[in-house]
A protein has these predicted regions:
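Juxtamembrane regions of bacterial inner-membrane/periplasmic proteins
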Residues: 2-434
Length: 434
């Protein structure tokens, strides 16, 4: 009769094997815990509202038909708000008499206000008329502006008003900002929406930081390799190894210290955020969280704050050269107060403009014109003009008393006062002259 051979008894695991298995289980448990933690963190990631300072505005200026108006003073008010005067259009050469077309009847030889409206944030001025592309601005009833306004003045009084091409009897202007109330972090923020930004602004940031943003899943092996190669060759880093998603999770959720554990968490969070959220939402959150230096007592956080501080205008009004300058500052957000620093920033800007052309995101002729422009950025970020600080303190106290606001700092409230900023500045100037 056949007898099967005896099977050997199983060996007991050695201490080394037990240690290896235990280490593997711990690593697996740690990885699972890290994934769950990262998943929970990323849930509210791009949609979490950023804290904003509360702002106090002066009285909203108004123009009314028949009321006194000095165009020079109106132009000065617009300039103080960051509006730029457009250069006068050169006169067209006179046509030969034989070829001249019949002239259309007109009350005067000048262009009527409202024809050829200026761009948003700019104005045209003549002896009897002013046209301005109003920005959007807050009012107690909601947001206003965003349309061209044309003003005609005769004998020192408003004779005609046209808002958005339509005749009106009254028109509001943008109110001056009197004060901002910052939270404990001291952050100046003007959040932007991606859909409101021109392509040149967004492309400048992408070209500087992550030109493959829309083609990777959070990590970019090619960007890491390129950054390492440039480092090895001892050249300036034109594009870092971290993707925009990595930079964002690092800025929002991770400590500043650099070590392997933090880099691992950064990579894991970046991948999970890319899985859970839309690319455009991630990019918008990034543009609202970049550090761009300091303005007075506040840190400049986000594209909206940076454009206002460095160029005195919202990002929607930046030209190609200005947009490239801001993008070139992301890696080194220092002031440009010395010739050496301005020269270094100018070089970075022009190299970035060249990269935009290489990527096909800007035309060669357009890039050459932008490279020929001066730097344009302020030597240091523009701090808001101080106006009536005692009045601002009293207004804050009144807001807390009347509306039960516990803390204005970082609350994002908009307060509107009755103070006339123009009269206040004239009074301060008169006192200073005595």
């Amino acid at each position: 009769m056949y007898r099967s051979p005896l099977l050997p008894l199983p060996r007991r695991p050695t201490a080394r094997q037990l240690a290896a298995w235990g280490t593997g289980l711990l690593l697996a448990a740690g990885l699972a815990a890290a994934v769950v933690h990262a998943w929970r963190i990323s849930r509210h990631f791009p949609t979490a509202p950023f804290p904003q300072p509360s702002r106090l505005y002066a009285r909203i200026p108004e123009l009314t038909l028949g009321e006194p108006c000095a165009l020079a003073e109106l132009a000065s008010r617009l300039t103080s708000l960051g509006y730029e005067r457009e250069p006068a259009a050169p006169a067209a050469p006179a046509a030969p008499a034989a070829a001249a077309a019949p002239a259309a009847p007109a009350a005067s030889g000048r262009r009527a206000p409202g024809d050829g409206s200026p761009r948003t944030g700019t104005f045209n001025l003549t002896a009897e008329a002013l046209s301005v592309g109003l920005r959007r601005f807050p009012t107690p009833a909601g947001w206003a502006g965003g349309q061209p306004l044309a003003v005609e003045v005769r004998a020192g009084r408003v004779a005609r008003l046209r808002l958005g091409g339509q005749p009106v009897a009254r028109a509001a202007l943008e109110p001056p900002l009197l004060a901002s109330f910052y939270g404990p972090a001291g952050e100046e923020r003007w959040p932007v929406r991606l859909e409101d930004l021109p392509a040149r602004v967004v492309r400048g940031v992408l070209a500087a930081e992550d030109d493959g943003f829309f083609h990777h899943s959070g990590l970019s092996a090619s960007a890491i390799a390129r950054a390492a190669w440039i480092d090895l060759r001892g050249r300036e880093i034109r594009q870092g190894g971290s993707t925009i998603t990595q930079q964002l999770v690092k800025n929002l959720y991770l400590p500043r210290r650099r070590n392997l554990l933090r880099k691992t968490k950064e990579a894991l969070l970046a991948e999970i955020v890319e899985l859970r959220h839309d690319k455009r939402a991630i990019l918008e959150a990034y543009l609202n969280s970049i550090y761009w230096g300091r303005s007075g007592p506040a840190n400049l956080i986000g594209m909206g704050a940076a454009a206002r501080a460095w160029f005195g205008k919202p990002p929607e009004e930046l030209d190609l050269a200005q947009a490239a300058t801001l993008a070139a500052m992301i890696r080194a957000p220092i002031d440009a107060s010395t010739p050496a620093r301005r020269a270094a920033l100018l070089g970075r800007r022009n190299r970035l403009l060249g990269r935009l052309a290489d990527l096909g995101w800007a035309g060669r002729d357009e890039v050459r014109r932008a490279q020929a422009e001066p730097l344009g950025a302020a030597a240091r970020p523009l701090a808001p003009r101080p106006c009536a600080p005692r009045f601002a303190d009293l207004a804050a106290q009144e807001a807390r008393r009347r509306f039960g606001i516990a803390d204005l700092a970082g609350g994002g409230y908009l307060l509107f006062s009755t103070l006339d900023a123009g009269e206040q500045w004239r009074a301060e100037a008169a006192l200073a002259a005595d």
